[in-house]
Amino acid sequence: MNHFPKLLSSQIGFDVAETLLAGFDRHYCIFREAAIRAKNLFEAADWHGLQKLARERITSYDERVRECIAKLEDEYDAENIDDDVWQQIKLHYIGLLTTHRQPECAETFFNSVCCHILHRSYFNNDFIFVRPAISTEYIENDEPAAKPTYRAYYPGKDGLAVTLERIVTNFQLNPPFENLTRDVQCVIQALRDNFGTFNEAPNFQIHVLSSLFFRNKAAYIIGRIINGDMMLPFALPVHHVKPGLLALDALLCKRDQLLIIFSFAHSYFLVDMEVPSAYVEFLGSILHGKPKAEIYTSVGLQKQGKNLFYRDLLRHLKHSSDRFIIAPGIKGMVMLVFTLPSFPYVFKLIKDAFPPPKETTREQVVGKYQLVKRHDRLGRMADTLEYSSVALPLSRLDDALIRELEKEAPSMLEYEGDNLVIRHVYIERRMVPLNIFLQNGTDADIEHGIREYGNAVKELMQANIFPGDMLYKNFGVTRHGRVVFYDYDEIEYLTDCNVRAVPPPRNEEDEMSGEPWYSVGPHDIFPETYNTFLLGDPRVRESFLKHHADFFDPALWQKQKDYILRGELPDFYPYDRSLRFSIRYPERFAADHVTAATERAA
C-alpha cells in the first residue's frame, strides 16, 4: 500500500493541521510559563504557590486537548472528515513540524486530539503517529537569543572553585547565597571524599543544563563532569536556609542518588526546556538505564512519557513470549493486579464489585488515584499511568488471569478478534511487596524495611496524606531499597481525619471484648490500634520499636495534623540527610555561626 498520496490537495487538511499545531503551541507555551513562574515562586519562598502551580500544570494538558477538540468540531465538523483528508492532515502536520523545537511532543498532542475524535479501530493505522515521524536528534535552539541546552565550563583555566561559583551565579537567583565560597569548598571536598584526587585530562570540562529543576522547596542544578573517559553525573540542590538567603545543600554524584531524585515516586519537576528532547538526551547520559518514557515524565511531560511507555510495551510484546499472569502476593479487595514477568510493571483494574467491609465505589477509587496524581508524592507514592482501551493479545494472557478478569471485572473487558481490550487500567512500576520482603528477608533486611516503612508513613503524614490501609502488603520496596506506598483506595487527607486515643475499658467485659467498646466515626483513626497488625512478627516488633516507637502515639499524628492546619510545609530531602553539607562538614559552618552570634551581640 502506498501511504503517501501523490498530491496534498486538501485545504481543509492543511487548515486542520495548522489548528492542531496551534493548539499544541498554546499548550507548550503555558508549560514553559509555569517553569518560568516556578523560579519566581522559589525565589520568593512561596511554597504554597509552587504547590498550586504544580497541580495546575498537571491538568493543563487535558484542558488544551479539550479546547482543540472543541475548535475542530466547531469549525471543521471533525468527526465527519473523510479518511483521505485525515491522511493528508497528518502529512501536512509532519511538514509543519520539520523545523519545530518540540516535534515529538507535538506528535503526541496530535494523537491525543485525534484519538478522541476517531474510533479506536483507527488507533494503529496511518492517521496517527504510531512511530515518530520527525527525528529529535541534533535539534538546537536559536542562540544567542535563547539559552543553550547546556553550558560548558573549563576548570583547567580558572580553577575548580572559580568555575563552580560561576556555574551557580549564572542562574541569577535573586536571593543572595549565605556563603557561596563556603558552599563551593564543600562541593570540592565532597568530590575529593568520593573520588580522591585525579589528574586533569585535556578534555576536563563541566556541562550544566541551562535551566534549574524546581520541586518541593528546592532548585536543582544538574550536570556532568567529563575528564578523559570518565563521566561523572551530579546534582546540586539549592535551598533557602534563612529568610532571603540561599545555600547549596549537598552534592549528589552517584548514579543511584540521581535515579532516586528522578524516581517514579516523586512529583514532576518544573523545568523550562525549549528543546525537551535535548534535555532528555542529556539526562539519559547521566541516568544510564532509565527509560526515556520515565525521563520525559519526570520533567513534567507526562503525556509524552505515557506515549513512549505504550510504544515500549508494544515493542516488548513483539520481542517476548511469556504470558501475563496474576501478580504474586495477597489479592486486594478493590484492585485486580496482573503483570508480565519479563516487563517491570504491574497492571491494575478496578473490580466491578467490592466485598465487605469495603464501602467505596469505582468513582471514588478513580478520585483517589487522581488525588495522588495531583499531590506532592515526596518519593513515597508510586506514580500511575492511566490508560483507556488497551488491547492485549489473548495468546499472551494466562488462562487463570482471563478467568479472574471475567470474574472480577467483566464490565472492563471487550473481545475484539484475537485481542482482549481493557477499557480502563492503571500501570505502575513493579516493586517487591513489603510483606514479602519482610517475610523472606534477613534480620538486616527487616530492620531496613521497617525503618523505611516508618519513615514513609511519617513523610506522608507531613504531606497531609493518611494511607488508610497501612498493612505491609500495600507498600512496596523499590530497587533502591526505598519503601513506597501504592494502594490508594482508602487514602485520605490527614486534616480530614479525627485522631483519637483509645478510651480506657469501662469494665472487664470491655477489656476482653473482641469488638470496640467505643464509638467509631467514619473519619476516626486510632494509632494505638495499629500495633495489632504491624507487630505480629517478633523480629519486626523489635525493629519497629527501635526506630519508630512513637508511631502508635496519637500525639505524633495530631502534631502533624496541627502543623499542616497552620499552613506550614516541612522540608523534604530525597537523599540521605548525612549528605547535607551542614551535617557532613559542620566545621565549615562553625565560623558562620560564630560570626552570626558576634553580630547579634553587637
Curated annotation (Swiss-Prot):
A GO biological-process term: tricarboxylic acid cycle
Subcellular locations according to the entry: Cytoplasm
Keywords annotated in UniProt: ATP-binding, Cytoplasm, Glyoxylate bypass, Hydrolase, Kinase, Nucleotide-binding, Protein phosphatase, Serine/threonine-protein kinase, Transferase, Tricarboxylic acid cycle
The keyword ATP-binding is assigned to this record: yes
Pfam families, alphabetized: AceK_kinase, AceK_regulatory
HAMAP family the UniProt entry points to: AceK (MF_00747)
Protein name stated in the entry: Isocitrate dehydrogenase kinase/phosphatase
Provenance organism: Paraburkholderia phymatum (strain DSM 17167 / CIP 108236 / LMG 21445 / STM815) (Burkholderia phymatum)
Organism phylogeny: Bacteria, Pseudomonadati, Pseudomonadota, Betaproteobacteria, Burkholderiales
UniProt gene name: aceK
